[in-house]
């Protein structure tokens, strides 16, 4: 899901080694060293709205460096994944750097070992290739839905390839006999010069990197003489560019209409596998068109592979993104594989299940995703992220599809899930299914799965006390798997909940394993998770499961009804404190959201009789000591947050305020049903009075009107701003005069734009204002920034 965060890539500045692009640096004197200087502001990947601040900081640093350390030479410039520079200078002068303005840290250079020369071996891919690469993906087509692919890169050398009949397709100047499709899916009205091009050397690094992992040519020489290969090195590549530069001014993004169009084109072009290393917060899955399109692609015989997301460090469990929630897709988490003997460890950024709203068990599998070397335009780079893990699985799927053309998409998925091997979690324990699904893919085992399972994994969802539920797993012979298998339920170390999984002792394949989950009256809340193991002699196959024993304490409140939109006054003072945690996601402190709310709650019930685009609340005023904040939940249950939208944080990647605190909570594309908003606080001392606005179905932007086209010198330009739905979002306001960003203040329905420093005469004002609903929108809305109004007018000063 988009800017780099939503593209689910974590790239470390010191890892990036791009051949042919590095600026010239000269060694100055003896004892020259190269270090990395980090400046005060966070990088764009963490704070996308701070581009101007970062640019100003960097300019100030370079000016000061030239004056105070004239022997220093700037090499790499970092903005996306770090804010700073690499600097070469005499070792004796390094201490001078810490005294320069804006310097936060000075780090020594570090050397990292690229891994794409090892990761195919780590998942067992070369064993399937054959001595002449006859079964290395020959004839398979992998569609890369991403930011574009550099077809001229040596990793995609077309020598020895003949395109299939009817290919190449699309923008043929960006195709070869290896990269056989080049299409772009830009949003309507995109004005960036490269928006309509299937490849842009400045913005196609991510897609080129992903494509190389999936299907880069075997035995290609990369940085430092490393010899690298993609997982399915003889497969063809289809380039379906959806991440394009947008008018929002932020990093490339894609909305659902463009992504769905790309999926449809990939299916129409006959791709065997689709890889989508992007994502965003989950919405109601029955209304998630991208997830539904991937399910449809699977039904059409195309294997959909999706990155699980990179949000675990930020928001904890329940962070798997859309469209990794697609039921039929292979959602992929990331692991780091290192050491001798090798050890597989869950990557600390890799999103952990369940899915946020649908509570599905995802990811399905895991694959290498840390420090992976692959192609980028003009050279090579090492990136980390589930974006890098997913194409390992896409390549693996292509290998299996070539070797087993009779397998269905569901059978191929089962072969990878049921044969996975364990990774470790951050505590050194065997990782639970929420971290790795069936485990790290192991291609030699997946090539001979013995049995196919349907479903491949089980989510029990939320389990109430004094309840039981039943289900079944269909097992079929995949070749050599017929006969009696022993069955056992093995719980993970993190499975702390009370409850019992009841299984038969054995199963005769083909056949059905029936199960029952029983939760007693006094069961302890927590996760009920592990594997249903199938054993026959030395053979082991397994089906992952997850559920959570949960108590809906919020339902014990006497809730008030919100029957119509409007402005309300309320207080939490004197109310019961029944709930301290809300989920999912479970631990959003990494994005500045309070995780434990020990104060009292005031609860309002909301009943939706029909489908709407959205609804929500925003706190517009608090009492002097009040620290109340909102949480939106479904079914009046604190265990059913309406996803990221239910938290008081802006999560629209097109806004500069992305992941900033906002006193609003809501739901995007909700189904009819019962919801509740809980007003809560971190402590009892934070209880107090507050005023809030409640809206339903806000799909229109604010209204803006220039008050006067003539403004006295040094006086502000004034624009009336109003919004009858969610209300004007003051922090969203961006104003420029003649292209220069200027201060703007919203008060009493007026936006006042500073004209200080501008000469008398005619000027051009561009004012962008969003409402609070915009802070909750994602790429799943049909248009970019539908709740934002941009006013462009001329005025005369003086």
Which functions belong to the PLM regions below?
Residues 23-115:
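Inhibitory N-terminal propeptides of secreted protease zymogens
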Residues 493, 589-651:
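Acidic, Ser/Thr/Pro-rich low-complexity intrinsically disordered segments
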Residues 75-77, 82, 95-160, 189-192, ...:
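Protease zymogen maturation seam
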Residues 136-138, 239-328, 355-360, 374-391, ...:
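Substrate-binding/access-modulating region of protease and related hydrolase catalytic domains
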Residues 211-215, 219, 242-243, 272, ...:
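Hydrolase catalytic cores
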Residues 173-191, 324-398:
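Extracellular S/T/G-rich loop segment that most often corresponds to the catalytic His/Ser-adjacent loop
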């Amino acid at each position: 899901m988009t800017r780099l965060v939503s593209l689910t890539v974590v790239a470390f500045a010191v890892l990036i080694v791009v051949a042919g692009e590095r600026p010239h640096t000269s060694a100055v004197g003896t004892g020259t060293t190269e270090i990395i200087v980090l400046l005060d502001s966070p990088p764009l990947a963490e704070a996308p709205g701070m581009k101007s601040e970062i640019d100003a900081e960097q300019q100030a640093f370079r000016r000061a460096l030239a004056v105070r350390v004239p022997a220093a030479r700037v090499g790499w410039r970092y903005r996306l994944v770090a804010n700073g520079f690499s600097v070469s200078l005499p070792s004796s002068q390094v201490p001078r750097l810490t005294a320069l303005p804006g310097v936060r840290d000075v780090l020594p250079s570090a050397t990292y070992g690229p891994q794409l020369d090892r990761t195919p071996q780590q998942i067992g891919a070369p064993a399937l290739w054959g001595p002449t690469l006859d079964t290395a993906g020959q004839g398979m087509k992998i569609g890369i839905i991403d930011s574009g692919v550099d077809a001229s890169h040596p990793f995609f050398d077309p020598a020895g390839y003949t395109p299939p009949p009817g290919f190449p397709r699309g923008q043929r100047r960006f195709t070869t006999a290896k990269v056989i499709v080049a299409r772009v899916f830009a949003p309507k009205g995109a004005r960036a010069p490269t928006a309509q091009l299937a490849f842009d050397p400045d913005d196609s690094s991510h897609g080129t990197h992903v494509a190389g992992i999936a299907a880069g040519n075997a035995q290609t020489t990369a940085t430092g003489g490393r010899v690298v290969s993609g997982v399915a090195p003889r497969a063809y590549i289809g380039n379906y560019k959806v991440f394009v530069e947008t008018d929002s001014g932020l990093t490339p993004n894609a909305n659902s209409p463009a992504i769905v169009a790309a999926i449809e084109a990939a299916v129409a072009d006959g791709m065997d596998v689709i890889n989508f290393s992007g994502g965003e917060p989950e919405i109601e899955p029955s209304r998630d068109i991208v997830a539904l399109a991937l399910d449809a692609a699977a039904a059409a015989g195309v294997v959909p592979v999706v990155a699980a997301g990179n949000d675990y460090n930020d928001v904890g469990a329940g962070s798997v993104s859309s469209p990794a929630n697609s039921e039929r897709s292979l959602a992929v988490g990331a692991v780091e594989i290192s050491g001798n003997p090798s050890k597989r460890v869950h990557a600390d950024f890799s999103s952990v299940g369940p899915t946020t709203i649908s509570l599905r068990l995802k990811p399905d599998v895991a694959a290498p995703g840390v420090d992976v070397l692959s192609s980028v335009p003009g050279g090579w780079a090492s990136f980390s992220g589930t974006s890098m893990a997913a194409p390992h699985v896409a390549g693996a799927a292509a290998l299996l599809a070539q070797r087993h053309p009779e397998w269905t998409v569901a059978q191929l998925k089962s072969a990878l899930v049921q044969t996975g091997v364990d990774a470790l979690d951050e505590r050194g324990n065997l990782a639970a299914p929420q971290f790795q699904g069936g485990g790290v893919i192991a291609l030699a085992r997946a090539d001979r799965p013995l049995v196919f399972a349907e479903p491949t994994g089980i989510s029990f969802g939320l389990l109430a006390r004094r309840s039981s539920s039943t289900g079944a797993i269909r097992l079929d012979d995949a070749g050599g798997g017929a006969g009696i298998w022993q069955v056992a339920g093995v719980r993970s170390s993190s499975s702390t909940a009370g409850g019992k999984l009841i299984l038969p002792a054995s199963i005769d394949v083909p056949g059905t394993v029936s199960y029952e989950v029983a939760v007693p009256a006094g069961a302890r809340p927590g996760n009920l998770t592990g594997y249903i193991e199938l054993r026959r002699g030395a053979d082991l196959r397994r089906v992952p499961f997850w559920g959570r024993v949960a108590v809906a304490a919020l339902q014990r409140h006497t809730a008030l009804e919100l029957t119509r939109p409007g402005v309300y006054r309320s207080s939490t003072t004197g109310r019961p404190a029944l709930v301290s945690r809300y989920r999912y996601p479970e631990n959003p402190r990494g994005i500045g959201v309070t995780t434990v709310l020990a104060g009292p709650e005031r609860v309002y019930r909301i009943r939706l009789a029909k489908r709407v685009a959205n609804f929500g609340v925003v706190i517009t005023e608090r009492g002097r000591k009040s620290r109340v904040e909102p949480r939106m939940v479904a079914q009046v249950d604190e265990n059913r947050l309406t996803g990221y939208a239910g938290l008081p944080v802006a999560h629209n990647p097109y806004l500069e305020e992305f992941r900033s605190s906002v006193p609003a909570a809501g739901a995007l594309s909700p189904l009819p049903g019962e919801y509740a908003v809980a007003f809560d606080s971190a402590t009892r001392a934070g209880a107090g009075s507050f005023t809030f606005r409640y809206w339903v179905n806000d799909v229109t932007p604010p209204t803006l009107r220039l008050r006067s086209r003539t403004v006295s010198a040094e006086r502000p330009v004034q624009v009336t701003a109003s919004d009858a739905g969610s209300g004007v979002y003051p922090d969203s306001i961006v104003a420029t005069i003649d292209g220069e960003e200027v201060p703007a203040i919203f008060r009493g329905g007026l936006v006042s734009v500073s004209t200080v420093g501008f000469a008398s005469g005619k000027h051009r004002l561009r004012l962008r204002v969003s409402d609070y609903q915009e802070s909750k929108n994602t790429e799943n809305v049909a248009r970019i920034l539908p709740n934002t109004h941009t006013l462009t007018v001329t005025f005369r000063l003086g």
